[in-house]
Structures are given as C-alpha cells and as structure tokens.
C-alpha cells in the first residue's frame, strides 16, 4: 500500500484545493453554449450571465412564451447571438433533434449545460410507478441522449458538459424518492463517463453540479411549509455553475452551508476510484 500513499495524498489535495486558475468573464466571449430548462429559474439566470459575458446561446424549455422573453433579454444583455427551440424532454426524439438544430444555429458547440427537470411534488412514495418512470426519463435518460448527441461537436472544441444535479443525488432525503433516484443516476452515469474520457483521452470535461435548496420560483412553491431552511440565491448559484464548468472542475457544490462540499464530497470514494482505475488495461480501451 505504501506505493499508493503519494498518489492518494495528491488526489486528496487535488480534491480539496481546486485549480488555481481564476475564472474570467472573457473566457465565455464568443463561446457557443446550449442551456436546457432555460425559461425560468437557474437556467434563465445562467442564460443571462452567459449573455453578459458575450456568449452565443441556444436555449430550450417547454414554454415558448417564456423562452421568447429570455432570448429578448439575452440580446439586451449583450449575447453574441441568442436563439430558442421549444419542446419537451419527455420526447427523446426531440432531445436528439434539438442538439442537431442547435449545433447548426451555433456552428458548433463549446458548452452543454443540462438543467431541465420534470415537475416534482414532495410527497410520500406509495405506488406511483409512473412518477418514477417520468423522473428517470426526463431527469436522467434525456441527459444521456442530449450529451451523446452533442459529444461529436464537443470533441472538436475540447468542450465541457455541466450536469445540474442536487444534494438529493448525493444523500437520501424524504418525500422526493423519484427525484432523488434520477439524481443519483446522473452521478453514477456521468462520473463513470468522466473516467472513460480519462481512459480514452477524450478532452471533454464533465462537471457535476450538486445544488442545495435554491430560491427558484418552482422550488419555493413546492417546498412551502415543508422545508424550513433558507434558500440560497439562484443568481449566484447560476454563476458558480458557469465558473466551475469553464474551469473544468469535476464537481461544483452550491449551498448555504460551507460544510456541504466537505461532508458530501466523499474523498473515500475518490480514493477507491483512483485505486481501482489502476487495475485496468487502459491501452485496450484507447485502441478501441
């Protein structure tokens, strides 16, 4: 085990002390970005931040009226260009088609921000299998479809993917079983794909964004009278997601508590993943 000690220490230090590179707004100047779930909440705020930084944006959500308003505001804020394509991520054919159409509008892709979710109601789980299926399809499977469709463009640009997840995807909480299951699935799938990118030398970063209780209109409405803690601001949350994605971090934590990254970051898991990766014949996967 002694031969693993130094690599493990380096891993731990790397986890707790993120990259020294500082974020600069000009890093987004002219970048081509897709944002899903962009008609309101965190998605809308990300679109506004990106626009102020001079990015090209293509937005999607179910509400065409909401998207029209956001795109108009994006152009006012200084977006290099702003377009929208309305549709539902319950339709996997639309999800795949959306990426193709967005790529044509942008002329490529530098960053894919996956932020949409299906409607979630806080309640005890009894026998609503339909709710579980819908959550897994919209909150998880559509993310797989979108990222798979976008990967060829992202490989060309050495781009980035942001996966908007939740503390409910790192720890169990009552009343949101279906939602939590879909968020755990995001971690399992995309953290695995990140390892595969490392093994096969694919220079596309994947940033898992682990969010706490954020003051979006939807979250405040659904949790009214149930969650007693104070929500964190969506504007700052959106900016932290963008920063972490641009800096190609593996994970971004945003919550009112500064203890969240330490308690949920799970360095033990990272050590085990690092050690297990050493047992693979990487040359086999690179050649395939």
UniProtKB/Swiss-Prot annotation:
The active site is at residue 179. InterPro entries: 11-beta-HSD, NAD(P)-bd_dom_sf, Sc_DH/Rdtase_CS, SDR_fam. GO terms for molecular function: 11-beta-hydroxysteroid dehydrogenase (NADP+) activity; 7-beta-hydroxysteroid dehydrogenase (NADP+) activity; NADP binding; protein homodimerization activity; steroid binding. Residues 1-4 are cytoplasmic. It is a single-pass type II membrane protein. Changing residue 110 to N: Slight loss of activity. Liver, kidney, lung and testis. Brain. Expressed in liver (at protein level). Residues 21-288 are lumenal. Glycosylated. Its EC number is 1.1.1.146, 1.1.1.201. Pfam families: adh_short (PF00106). Glycans are attached at residues 158, 203. It is an enzyme of class 1 (oxidoreductase). NADP(+) binds at residues 37-63, 88-89, 115-117, 179-183, 212-218. SUPFAM superfamilies: NAD(P)-binding Rossmann-fold domains. It is found in: Endoplasmic reticulum membrane. Keywords: Endoplasmic reticulum, Glycoprotein, Lipid metabolism, Membrane, NADP, Oxidoreductase, Signal-anchor, Steroid metabolism, Transmembrane, Transmembrane helix. GO terms for biological process: cellular response to estradiol stimulus; glucocorticoid biosynthetic process; glucocorticoid catabolic process; lung development; mineralocorticoid metabolic process; regulation of pentose-phosphate shunt; response to nutrient levels; steroid catabolic process. GO terms for cellular component: apical part of cell; endoplasmic reticulum membrane; intracellular membrane-bounded organelle; nuclear membrane. The keyword Amino-acid biosynthesis does not apply. It catalyses: an 11beta-hydroxysteroid + NADP(+) = an 11-oxosteroid + NADPH + H(+); corticosterone + NADP(+) = 11-dehydrocorticosterone + NADPH + H(+); a 7beta-hydroxysteroid + NADP(+) = a 7-oxosteroid + NADPH + H(+); 7-oxocholesterol + NADPH + H(+) = 7beta-hydroxycholesterol + NADP(+). Substrate binds at residue 166. Controls the reversible conversion of biologically active glucocorticoids such as 11-dehydrocorticosterone to corticosterone using NADP(H). Participates in the corticosteroid receptor-mediated anti-inflammatory response, as well as metabolic and homeostatic processes. Bidirectional in vitro, predominantly functions as a reductase in vivo, thereby increasing the concentration of active glucocorticoids. It has broad substrate specificity, besides glucocorticoids, it accepts other steroid and sterol substrates. Homodimer. This is 11-beta-hydroxysteroid dehydrogenase 1.
């Amino acid at each position: 085990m002694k031969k693993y000690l130094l690599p493990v220490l380096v891993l731990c230090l790397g986890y707790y002390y993120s990259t020294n590179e500082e974020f600069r707004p000009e890093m987004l100047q002219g970048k081509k970005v897709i944002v899903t779930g962009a008609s309101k909440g965190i998605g809308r705020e990300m679109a506004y931040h990106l626009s102020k930084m001079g990015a090209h944006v293509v937005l999607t959500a179910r509400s065409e009226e909401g998207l029209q308003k956001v795109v108009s505001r994006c152009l006012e804020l200084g977006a290099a260009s702003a377009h929208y394509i309305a549709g539902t991520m319950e339709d996997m054919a639309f999800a795949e088609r959306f990426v193709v159409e967005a790529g044509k509008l942008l002329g490529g892709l530098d960053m894919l921000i996956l932020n949409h979710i299906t409607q979630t109601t806080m309640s005890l789980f009894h026998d609503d299998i339909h709710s579980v299926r819908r959550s897994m399809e919209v909150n998880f499977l559509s993310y797989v479809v979108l990222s798979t469709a976008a990967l060829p463009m992202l490989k060309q640009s050495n781009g980035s993917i942001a996966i908007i997840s939740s503390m409910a995807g790192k720890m169990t909480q009552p009343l949101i079983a279906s939602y939590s299951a879909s968020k755990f699935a995001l971690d399992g799938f995309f953290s695995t794909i990140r390892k595969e990118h490392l093994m096969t030398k694919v220079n596309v970063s994947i940033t898992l964004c682990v969010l706490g209780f954020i003051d979006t209109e939807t979250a405040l409405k659904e949790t009214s009278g149930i969650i007693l803690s104070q929500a964190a601001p969506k504007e700052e949350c959106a900016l932290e997601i963008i920063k972490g994605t641009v800096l190609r971090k593996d994970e971004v934590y945003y919550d009112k508590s500064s203890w969240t990254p330490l308690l949920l970051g799970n360095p033990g898991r990272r050590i085990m993943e690092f050690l297990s990766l050493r047992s693979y014949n990487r040359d086999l996967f690179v050649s395939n």
